[in-house]
Amino acid sequence: MEKEDAGAVQCGTGEGEAVVLNERSEQCSAFASIAGCDEAVAQCFLAENDWDMERAINSFFEPGVESALQNKAAADIADPLKQETMSGTASDSCIDLTGDDLVVTKSEATTSNSSTVKQEDESHFSFLTWNIDGLDESNVAERARGVCSYLALYSPDVVFLQEVIPPYYEYLKKRAVSYTIITGNEDEYFTAMMLKKSRVKLISQEIVPYPSTVMMRNLLVANVNISGNSICLMTSHLESTKDHSKERLKQLDIVLKKMMDAPPLATVIFGGDTNLRDQEVAKIGGMPNNILDVWDFLGKPEHCRYTWDTKVNKNLRAPYICRLRFDRIFFRASQEGSQVIPQSLYLAGTEKLDCGRFPSDHWGLLCDFAIIL
């Protein structure tokens, strides 16, 4: 990955720890040179194999789930989605991704948000939503490894994913053993939630259908407890393309009603690929009074205005420039008790992989929430 300049290594407090971290950084460089991969990917394989170089190399080249990813043809999945990308109208064995021995080999963590790589803090939790573009079969295995590298780097407590395909799901189950993963479906393509086992207790889950979707879309809901707080999590991938605006707004209405109907003592967080254009939100009169768009709430930060940006992200090789805020996070506060408040918002996935492409045609949104008693 290449967005920032120097490599940054997470420093320990003693000389011995510093030596170990330096040795591991050198191992990452050596592994990356041998395997022809990113150093962040190298770190993942070394960590899962107890920093044994030979075992890690063997694991990297082991056939298995990645072969399924490589061989999966997405051409027969969701024709409307393929039209969106072309029309110009749209816009390894297990690894614990929350391990304490994370070596940060790029400086994105310190440049974009120094709080993203940290020990668990009960007064905060982190959240990532990302359309990972599983329908694009090009470089899908390397892009999947890239997504897992970001999960290892940021170690978010909650992850929402859109455009997950079955081989990608199997890959995540194999790699992200520190998360409970639930999905909105298990066929063709779907949404998923990843809940860090050490922080998030899953209470219940629900799939809310969209009656008139033609793209297999739905709303995935999970009621969880984080640090003693009841939180209702929701993710969705709303209907794609400009031509399906009417259906998209129907789906948005279902989402907003579901958020408003959640128990009053619960905090509600929705995140996903909404495919919304600003004029569509204006058309319905804006957001309900008790539901906030986190980007608006945080002062409309320019650095994360666009999450689908063909000016910078050339994955689609689009012959046009289109910069839109498709990916959004909505928030409804609880009416009593401790409050969960959005604190910061950053883009994820903005570094190219060695294949010359980004992990997805979308940027991810990484949000930090404070828990105020």
Swiss-Prot record:
Q: Where is the active site?
A: 273 (proton donor/acceptor)
Return the similarity comment: Belongs to the CCR4/nocturin family. TTRAP/TDP2 subfamily.
Q: Spell out the InterPro entries in the cross-references.
A: Endo/exonu/phosph_ase_sf, Endo/exonuclease/phosphatase, TDP2-like, UBA-like_sf
Write down the Gene3D superfamilies for this protein, in alphabetical order.
DNA helicase RuvA subunit, C-terminal domain, Endonuclease/exonuclease/phosphatase
Gene Ontology CC: one annotated term: PML body
Known EC number(s)?
A: 3.1.4.-
**Per the UniProt entry, what is one GO biological process?**
double-strand break repair
Q: Does the keyword Protease apply?
A: no
Name the positions where Mg(2+) binds: 133, 163
Required cofactors, per record? Mg(2+); Mn(2+)
Interaction with 5' end of substrate DNA: where is this region? 131-135, 237-242, 275-277
Q: Which UniProt keywords apply?
A: DNA damage, DNA repair, Hydrolase, Magnesium, Metal-binding, Nuclease, Nucleus, Receptor
Pfam families xrefs: Exo_endo_phos, UBA_4
Q: Which GO terms describe its molecular function?
A: 5'-tyrosyl-DNA phosphodiesterase activity; magnesium ion binding; manganese ion binding; nuclease activity; single-stranded DNA binding
The name this protein carries in UniProt is: Tyrosyl-DNA phosphodiesterase 2
Localized where?
Nucleus; Nucleus, PML body
Q: Where is this site: Interaction with 5' end of substrate DNA?
A: 189, 308, 326, 362
According to its UniProt entry, what is the function of this protein? DNA repair enzyme that can remove a variety of covalent adducts from DNA through hydrolysis of a 5'-phosphodiester bond, giving rise to DNA with a free 5' phosphate. Catalyzes the hydrolysis of dead-end complexes between DNA and the topoisomerase 2 (top2) active site tyrosine residue. Hydrolyzes 5'-phosphoglycolates on protruding 5' ends on DNA double-strand breaks (DSBs) due to DNA damage by radiation and free radicals.
Q: What class of enzyme is it?
A: hydrolase
Note on how the cofactor is bound: Binds 1 magnesium or manganese ion per subunit.
The record lists the organism as Xenopus tropicalis
